[in-house]
Amino acid sequence: MSKTNKSKSGSRSSRSRSASRSRSRSFSKSRSRSRSLSRSRKRRLSSRSRSRSYSPAHNRERNHPRVYQNRDFRGHNRGYRRPYYFRGRNRGFYPWGQYNRGGYGNYRSNWQNYRQAYSPRRGRSRSRSPKRRSPSPRSRSHSRNSDKSSSDRSRRSSSSRSSSNHSRVESSKRKSAKEKKSSSKDSRPSQAAGDNQGDEAKEQTFSGGTSQDTKASESSKPWPDATYGTGSASRASAVSELSPRERSPALKSPLQSVVVRRRSPRPSPVPKPSPPLSSTSQMGSTLPSGAGYQSGTHQGQFDHGSGSLSPSKKSPVGKSPPSTGSTYGSSQKEESAASGGAAYTKRYLEEQKTENGKDKEQKQTNTDKEKIKEKGSFSDTGLGDGKMKSDSFAPKTDSEKPFRGSQSPKRYKLRDDFEKKMADFHKEEMDDQDKDKAKGRKESEFDDEPKFMSKVIGANKNQEEEKSGKWEGLVYAPPGKEKQRKTEELEEESFPERSKKEDRGKRSEGGHRGFVPEKNFRVTAYKAVQEKSSSPPPRKTSESRDKLGAKGDFPTGKSSFSITREAQVNVRMDSFDEDLARPSGLLAQERKLCRDLVHSNKKEQEFRSIFQHIQSAQSQRSPSELFAQHIVTIVHHVKEHHFGSSGMTLHERFTKYLKRGTEQEAAKNKKSPEIHRRIDISPSTFRKHGLAHDEMKSPREPGYKAEGKYKDDPVDLRLDIERRKKHKERDLKRGKSRESVDSRDSSHSRERSAEKTEKTHKGSKKQKKHRRARDRSRSSSSSSQSSHSYKAEEYTEETEEREESTTGFDKSRLGTKDFVGPSERGGGRARGTFQFRARGRGWGRGNYSGNNNNNSNNDFQKRNREEEWDPEYTPKSKKYYLHDDREGEGSDKWVSRGRGRGAFPRGRGRFMFRKSSTSPKWAHDKFSGEEGEIEDDESGTENREEKDNIQPTTE
């Protein structure tokens, strides 16, 4: 039934989707009520968006069937709503945020619209009256959009709804209200397509109905599988209340699902008094009453989906026809809201009323069929149900025949298409149920067949034609799927084609039945069947069945299809057997023949020995093939006799080459292991050793040595690459911290001035510290620093400057100054003390936000002084200067800047001030910096800052 529910919820899904548009209401009514009206109301109220997608799970317990039900317990935040859909990055924790919704962005398979979750619309949807709107095209389209998820929920809801009479009754109520609306809407659409409800029921059933038929076929899949077991069981509970016909609707295949919905109206002849509920209501009430129980569920869902059911239900008397026509028509109609017609509804109701007698008779027929079915094996029961479905549909067909007569051929065509689809569905059902169907259906067809014989013949013939194509491959496909497939195919077929097909099938079947044109037959058959339908139809059906049996299973299949409308399952099954025996069988045979012809050689050779195959192949060889073979033979002969082989196999030969190559490679590798080793060594490691050691050896010379080394090493691509990397990185960093670096540079320049005028030793000690720190950081910095060191040194024209660079970036920037200072500084003074360092800290501060004079310097200067002078600092300086407006200063002044600290320190000063301002410490350092010696007048303030920085650092 899950599938039945699926299909029901398929069509109902459209409805339910329409209804589901406000499924909260829909569900709250049907599902919620099944759970409890209070809860549904509460849910409706509390969960504005009871809609499957948006209401918080706790509010949407009703929707538990949903796979996502997790969200029921996941807070309406990202959790509840989304069944664990990944929230995605920018979703934040916004529970319902549009794109913050749980379902990725706009992912709402079932979700109506994310905004609907909270949107008043959902609230409105919750409100039942708005739900009534749900059948409206908007709802419908919405339903279609959310068809899958809606159908999922609808299916679950369907199951729920069908499970709970309460829900079903509510469904019927809702249907009565909704379907009244629907029937109004559907009636309007029906009027729009006066014929359209019957035909549209078919056409829509074929188009939208096909989807619904497909859904129905899904539905019917379960019911064929669980023909009586599941479908019948759940429907049987409903059906038990209703006549066997009702039950057969319960068991009906896709149409049966639909028919079940419609059939409930059919049984609704009994509930017919409940037409006041509106057909839908009747159907709902009927459905609740019996087959309506499940049918009602289906119908409730279906009716939900198709207000059109209400028209069919309006003539609940026309049990199957209303059910099928109404359900499918309604389904279709709801989907094609524009296509219904009130006139059609009236006409259809009248016809169905006319048919109601037939339906009742057909119910009897169904009962007979059911009995027959019951007599038959369980499959027979399924077949009986199929028959009953066919019968159910047959009454519909009968109803629809006058319907067709009264309504335009389009109605026929649609109806025919629908029947064709039904036939396809039922045929596929008949695949599984065909044999049983043949038994039960023929019996049930006794009742229904006269009515539907021609129709069934036409429809079934069409089905068989399609089926012959399909049955060949699909013969044993699950009827539901097959039906779906066929329905889809039929749907794909233009309705005219279908009509033609059906007419053609019926004409060919007409030979069997005598009714040639399906449309005419349907009109005639409907009228005649209505007349015959009472009691003669069963006999005629039996006779037809017998005839079909005599004619072959196929005609029965066809009449089965008519009956398939009435007792579709039976018809289906017969169709299957008959398909094989009859046109379908003939087609299958023809196809087999064609296939065999196509693959005849294969088949023949299949069992031959390989030698036979070879012989046949040789005999079949073309001259060119023979010529080529001849040449090949000659070549082999010549090679064998005239060209002796070296005795070495190809493998050996190539192995030899490989060995040679390997040996050569090994030799090459052995030749220059150091190159590889050096390359293998990471530049940072290399630099660590080279720079750190050189720098540590002597602050000045290491700068030289390192610089010389790296200058020599510039050949080392690692350094070059590292240099580039570091330069780029530093350029970026400098771009960012250019001010910082510039401040550093200015700090360095100022520091140079300060150092020159001031304590070089402080600077030296400090820079030694910094240099060591920088050596560490530089080693960590890796080659780029070393490269920078090289560049720095390269840029540092003076050795002293280079040493100072080595001593620190500050020094290189400071310039030569007293390079005794660098040594002294490096050796003697703690960086912190040195104002130069303060400046370094200043620039360091610039980069490091001047956390520590020493630390800032260490941060920057921690790159070993070599680094500072080396790449990061001097080249950085150069780079900064290249990038900076002070570029001329940067490159040229670097060398002279220490000396020409005046100009540079000013620039530095600017940066320094900026830096100092940047660093909270700067103010502190500035004030405490006064302690430091401000020897550089130019750098005075900066020196002061740097002093402050340095001194605090030192201090």
UniProtKB/Swiss-Prot annotation:
PTM sites of type Phosphothreonine: T324, T397, T874
Record-listed N6-acetyllysine modification sites: K221, K346, K455, K470, K481, K519, K527, K558, K811
Segments of this protein annotated with the region Required for mRNA splicing activation: 2-190
Outcome, altering S406A: Reduces phosphorylation upon DNA damage
A GO BP entry: positive regulation of transcription by RNA polymerase II
Highest taxon above the source species: Eukaryota
Phosphoserine modification, residue list: 220, 232, 237, 240, 243, 248, 253, 257, 315, 320, 323, 326, 339, 377, 379, 406, 408, 444, 468, 535, 560, 562, 575, 619, 622, 672, 682, 684, 698, 928, 939
GO CC annotations on file: extracellular exosome; mediator complex; nuclear speck; nucleoplasm; nucleus
Tissue: Ubiquitous.
Polar residues biased stretches: 204-220, 282-300
The keyword Transferase is annotated on this UniProt entry: no
Region (Disordered) residue spans: 1-94, 117-559, 663-955
Pfam families in alphabetical order: THRAP3_BCLAF1
Residues carrying Dimethylated arginine: R17
Leader sequence segment: none
GO molecular function: ATP binding; DNA binding; nuclear thyroid hormone receptor binding; nuclear vitamin D receptor binding; phosphoprotein binding; RNA binding; RNA polymerase II cis-regulatory region sequence-specific DNA binding; transcription coactivator activity
Region feature (Required for mRNA decay activity): 359-955
Predominant place of localization: nucleus
Biased composition (Low complexity): 82-94, 157-166, 305-331, 779-789, 848-859
Family: Belongs to the BCLAF1/THRAP3 family.
Function: Involved in pre-mRNA splicing. Remains associated with spliced mRNA after splicing which probably involves interactions with the exon junction complex (EJC). Can trigger mRNA decay which seems to be independent of nonsense-mediated decay involving premature stop codons (PTC) recognition. May be involved in nuclear mRNA decay. Involved in regulation of signal-induced alternative splicing. During splicing of PTPRC/CD45 is proposed to sequester phosphorylated SFPQ from PTPRC/CD45 pre-mRNA in resting T-cells.
Protein name, entry field: Thyroid hormone receptor-associated protein 3
Organism: Homo sapiens (Human)
Originating gene: THRAP3
